[in-house]
């Protein structure tokens, strides 16, 4: 395993995640300031995910054919353009357009995961994917806190900061990331099988198929949480007599990032060696289910933070373990295709979950919103036996 490309991709993912997490706690409040209801906020998040669904698989296939680095650069430049559009938005349609632009080019993390698969061995892959978990942890620690601080002065400042980070990510990829040889499919010269045929084959695989459904269940639960949490917290919690706003939500996300960084900081490799990836998937789903259940009944900040600990720990061990299991099962020349399929499943979950979350929160069904996340964790848990 080469350390220099892994360090470079870690740095790039970190900068990308910082931009994402700066936007995350702000976007619902930014949209509300332009007249959006919770249901419309859900539609906004879903529109971004729908564009990812359209663009994700082709980007994965393209990265298999031409290499990860060129596709990563195009994705990052699209994100930069989307953030600039968002910062200049003065009406809801401009916010939607900005998120659509970003969504259509949002292959950053997909291609980064494929790059990690290219430069690691199966034995070290889970630990290497844990680096993405560390990047997410650090991003959630720094980004939301910075967003909450900057939003006190103007809702535009955090978005401009995210745009600057996106431009930095482009420069890091161009100057720091070594190119790796593409992995075109062996059928290229004789005619490639269709994308849908490859997807169907993946779902028919006795072990890979259930793992893909587990990934969908995890992503649905995760999307339920992060698409609706800001609006949920605004209606459920107060600080100094005022409802939660971008600052408070940003600090809660930062707390989540701290827990995630503590769990991922060198710990995922030892946990995999001790318990195995399958066991960590089981623990992850269980921990997240408990966290959602606690969140459904919490009215005090203390219980909120306890719920966040369970949710963050669960996702921190589940995401890299399940991703490693899926990519290890896939043939080397189809790594990009399988990860593109995972991106599609993620996008489908991210289309549906925010719509449901927005409607539930608009109807003031706050506890039901949290229990929906717990339900999908239970579904993911129920699929564990079929993957053994």
Summary of predicted features, one role per range:
Residues 56-67, 263-277, 361:
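Helix-to-loop junctions at the C-terminal end of transmembrane segments
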Residues 98-137:
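Cytoplasmic helix-loop-helix junction between adjacent transmembrane helices
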Residues 70-85, 279-294:
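Structural signature of the two symmetry-related core transmembrane helices
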Residues 35, 67, 88-93, 297-299:
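Helix-breaking motifs and short loop linkers at transmembrane-helix boundaries and internal kinks
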Residues 131-175:
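Helix-loop-helix hairpin linking two adjacent transmembrane segments in secondary transporters
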Residues 25-39, 228-248:
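Short amphipathic helix-loop junctions that connect adjacent transmembrane helices
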Residues 2-3, 179-213:
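Juxtamembrane intracellular "pre-TM" segments in multi-pass secondary transporters
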Residues 21, 49-57, 107, 140-141, ...:
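Residue-level signature of mid-helix packing/kink "hotspots" within the transmembrane helices
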């Amino acid at each position: 395993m080469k350390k220099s490309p892994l360090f470079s991709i870690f740095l790039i993912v970190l900068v990308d995640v910082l931009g994402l997490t700066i936007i995350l706690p702000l976007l619902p409040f930014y949209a509300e300031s332009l007249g959006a209801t919770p249901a419309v906020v859900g539609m906004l998040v879903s529109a971004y995910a729908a564009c990812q669904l359209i663009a994700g698989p082709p980007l994965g296939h393209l990265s298999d054919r031409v290499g990860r680095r060129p596709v990563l650069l195009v994705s990052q430049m699209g994100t930069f353009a989307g953030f600039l559009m968002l910062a200049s938005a003065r009406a809801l349609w401009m916010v939607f357009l900005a998120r659509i632009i970003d969504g259509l080019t949002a292959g950053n993390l997909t291609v980064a995961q494929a790059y990690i698969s290219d430069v690691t061995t199966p034995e070290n892959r889970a630990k290497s994917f844990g680096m993405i978990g560390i990047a997410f942890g650090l991003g959630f620690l720094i980004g939301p806190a910075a967003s909450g601080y900057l939003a006190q002065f103007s809702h535009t400042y955090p978005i401009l900061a995210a745009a600057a980070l996106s431009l930095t990510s482009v420069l890091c990829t161009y100057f720091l990331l070594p190119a790796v040889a593409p992995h075109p499919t062996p059928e290229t010269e004789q005619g490639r099988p269709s994308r849908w045929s490859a997807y169907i084959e993946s779902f028919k695989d006795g072990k890979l198929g259930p793992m893909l459904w587990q990934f969908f269940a995890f992503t649905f639960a995760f999307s339920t949480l992060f698409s609706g949490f800001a609006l949920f917290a605004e209606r459920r919690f107060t600080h100094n007599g005022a409802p939660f706003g971008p600052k408070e939500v940003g600090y809660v996300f930062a707390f989540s990032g701290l827990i995630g960084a503590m769990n991922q900081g060198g710990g995922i490799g030892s946990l995999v060696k001790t318990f195995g990836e399958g066991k960590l998937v089981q623990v992850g789903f269980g921990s997240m289910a408990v966290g959602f259940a606690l969140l459904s009944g919490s009215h005090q900040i203390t219980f909120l933070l306890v719920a966040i600990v369970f949710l963050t720990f669960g996702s921190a061990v589940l995401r890299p373990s399940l991703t490693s299991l899926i990519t290890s099962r896939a043939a080397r020349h189809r790594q990009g295709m399988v990860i593109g399929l995972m991106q599609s499943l993620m996008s489908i979950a991210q289309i549906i979950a925010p719509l449901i979350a927005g409607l539930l929160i608009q109807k003031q069904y706050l506890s039901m919103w949290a229990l929906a996340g717990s339900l999908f964790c239970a579904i993911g848990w129920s699929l564990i036996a079929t993957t053994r």
